[in-house]
């Protein structure tokens, strides 16, 4: 039996084209998508136009809408920026590092009682690594723990979603939050609210 070779995207545009092919059907091959995203070697000249930072919090910048099958976006993390603990609304979530490092902390789903949430693991994601999570794996928080270097990550969500739940680590209490885009296709979104952007 032949071993299928991982296509190596030469550019970000190439990666997007391959992702469109991979998501053309109804099934998602998680391992294949993760391998393709990891195989792309980050080149800032290809993604800099999407990398729009905010002084106070991380930003979500839409790159491609994946024919309705997925959203591809670039998240920009200033020094010390981080997300809340959150779920992924029954979607697949792929996170590939383009620049810098991010710390991912994985949590178990809270039980019904008001107890502190249980930390399952933590790891540091480095440039060109690609991680995967879905709701059956657990919840996570992502943080740029550097106080000197920004971080940039490429995220794919399938199917796309615009709300999720953010969790209080001390009690497990959850709130529904709506995510907005800081920019779309390299253009700053007018009136993007900075209040309830919680997702990555």
Swiss-Prot record:
Pfam families linked: CDO_I (PF05995)
List the molecular function annotations (GO) for this entry: cysteine dioxygenase activity; ferrous iron binding; nickel cation binding; zinc ion binding
Q: Which cofactor does it need?
A: Fe(2+); Ni(2+); Zn(2+)
Q: Please give the PANTHER family that the UniProt record associates with this protein.
A: CYSTEINE DIOXYGENASE (PTHR12918), CYSTEINE DIOXYGENASE TYPE 1 (PTHR12918:SF1)
Give the family, as the similarity comment puts it.
Belongs to the cysteine dioxygenase family.
Q: What does the subunit section of this Swiss-Prot or TrEMBL entry state?
A: Monomer.
Q: What is this protein called?
A: Cysteine dioxygenase type 1
Q: What is the lineage of its organism?
A: Eukaryota, Metazoa, Chordata, Craniata, Vertebrata
* Gene transcribed to yield this protein: CDO1
């Amino acid at each position: 039996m032949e071993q299928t070779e991982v296509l190596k995207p030469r550019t970000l545009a190439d990666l997007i084209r391959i992702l469109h092919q991979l998501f053309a059907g109804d099934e998602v091959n998680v391992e294949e998508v993760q391998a393709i995203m990891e195989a792309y070697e980050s080149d800032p000249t290809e993604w800099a136009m999407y990398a729009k930072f905010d002084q106070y919090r991380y930003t979500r910048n839409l790159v491609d809408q994946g024919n309705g099958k997925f959203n591809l976006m670039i998240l920009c993390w200033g020094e010390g920026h981080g997300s809340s603990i959150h779920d992924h609304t029954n979607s697949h979530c792929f996170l590939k590092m383009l620049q810098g490092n991010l710390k991912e902390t994985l949590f178990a789903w809270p039980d019904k009682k008001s107890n502190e949430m249980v930390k399952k693991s933590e790891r540091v994601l480095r440039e060109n690594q690609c991680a995967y999570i879905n709701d059956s794996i657990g919840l996570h928080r992502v943080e740029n723990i550097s106080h000197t270097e920004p971080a940039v990550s490429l995220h794919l969500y399938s199917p796309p979603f615009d709300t999720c739940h953010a969790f209080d680590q001390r009690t497990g209490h959850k709130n529904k939050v709506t995510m907005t885009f800081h920019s779309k296709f390299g253009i700053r979104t007018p009136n993007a609210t900075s209040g309830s952007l919680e997702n990555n």
